[in-house]
């Protein structure tokens, strides 16, 4: 077909039996189609790997660092078992890694606009850790990774400790 829109149209009108595409785009479209009452599924087989991540403009290294470290912090929080509902229990931790995660700005931001020492607490309070955000974005959001449109367990989207490729450098 000519483009992704045409492929989708052919699939929906029955001209073809299978429709492939970028996983994140297919998930977004599947949500819309389910809202229209269609019972469709995304098959687990991947034809290609298309890593996606946050992007920032080229000329703002400070902003790029903040975006990257928010991601690393969300991963690190999950590794420590810290999430959007319990991070307050860890604020006074004597574990140096947890203390850096929750109580240090890591030198991020700019001289005129540095991050606060509690920036990661703000992130966790707003969106949670990586698990929380994934569950809310790709699953039913009940906290149990149920009814996921893109499975995480056993895939590259999981933490390194669980066989995936998601990891973060030390928070320093």
Summary of predicted features, one role per range:
Residues 5, 12-41:
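A ligand-binding cleft/hinge motif common to bilobed small-molecule-binding domains
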Residues 5, 9-13, 65-72:
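Solvent-exposed, polar/charged alpha-helical surfaces in well-ordered, non-transmembrane soluble domains
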Residues 37, 50-53, 150:
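A near-ubiquitous, low-amplitude feature marking generic local secondary-structure context
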